[in-house]
A protein has these predicted regions:
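RNA pseudouridine synthases
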Residues: 1-274
Length: 274
């Protein structure tokens, strides 16, 4: 089929070619340098660096966070048989705090908290433009009709999603913002920021890549190019997560410090805006 707009007629013949399904591969423990924020008999909390895939998948059969977890920890929850210990995920380019369950009881306990929206999460991001001081985005999210690898806001279908935001500081041409997702949809924060005209910096999949710089005065060109080199990924960091501990039933808050690329970018922006 040469064009997606081509309409089929009766008796048309279609030849389909499918790639063979990958052979199920055992997940091999690998010695990775994990930044372990907290650990006890029930759970572990990791500060995931940007660029690290959470679990093996198509094209990523090794060097993932899960490979490192299997090496470092004697026990992990069974969870999904292919993702032991993994309670929730972060995108490859997103840095920050991620929870790991060390037994099935803890996994179930944490899963229920996510399902019941008890988990409190805070992200920090750099977004394009001057975002209003605070607000919320409430849009349903679904697969993009033309590009199935990304998501988009939709009407009358999709999955409901809600994000609160608060601008911390405007450092032209970007805003430093805190994001508080109340639902946990895939790419939620990235989709929501794009939907209100302030995509996350260097998020090319959602309109925030280098091309977005054309929206700004030429006086910002040199600064933007410098920032793109400083943060060669989506400028999004999972800074805090607050949960009921599955053993003690006490609230606990875990925080991942800002990574060097974001610290450096903020220093550059503050210097240029002083």
């Amino acid at each position: 089929i040469g064009k997606s707009s081509l309409k089929l007629k009766n008796n048309d013949a279609i030849e389909c070619c499918f790639e063979p399904m990958p052979i199920d591969k055992a997940i091999i423990p690998e010695k990775l340098n994990l930044d372990i924020i907290y650990e006890d008999a029930h759970l572990a909390v990791i500060n995931k660096p940007a660029g690290l895939v959470v679990h093996p998948g198509s094209g990523n059969y090794g060097g993932t966070l899960l490979n490192g977890l299997l090496y470092h920890f004697k026990t992990l929850s069974k969870g999904d048989s292919h993702r032991p210990g993994i309670v929730h995920r972060l995108d490859k380019d997103t840095s920050g705090v991620i929870l790991i369950a060390k037994n099935d009881q803890s996994h179930e306990h944490l899963n229920k908290q996510f399902s019941n929206r008890l988990v409190k999460k805070e992200y920090i991001a750099l977004v394009w433009g001057k975002l209003e001081e605070e607000g919320c985005v409430e849009h349903a999210i679904d697969r993009h009709p033309k590009n199935r690898k990304i998501l988009t806001v939709v009407q009358n279908k999709g999955r409901n999603s809600l994000t609160y935001y608060k601008r911390v500081e405007y450092l032209a041409p970007l805003s430093m913002v805190n994001l508080y997702p109340k639902t946990g949809r895939k790419h939620q924060l990235r989709v929501h920021m794009k939907s209100i005209g302030h995509p996350i910096f260097n998020d090319s999949a959602y309109g925030g890549g280098a091309k977005y710089a054309k929206s700004f005065h030429i006086k910002y060109t040199q600064l933007i190019n410098r920032l793109l080199k400083t943060i060669p990924r989506v400028a999004l960091h999972a800074r805090k997560i607050e949960i009921l501990h599955p053993g003690s039933e006490q609230w606990m808050c875990f925080e991942a410090p800002l990574p060097l690329d974001l610290i450096t970018a903020l220093e550059i922006l503050k210097s240029e805006n002083s």
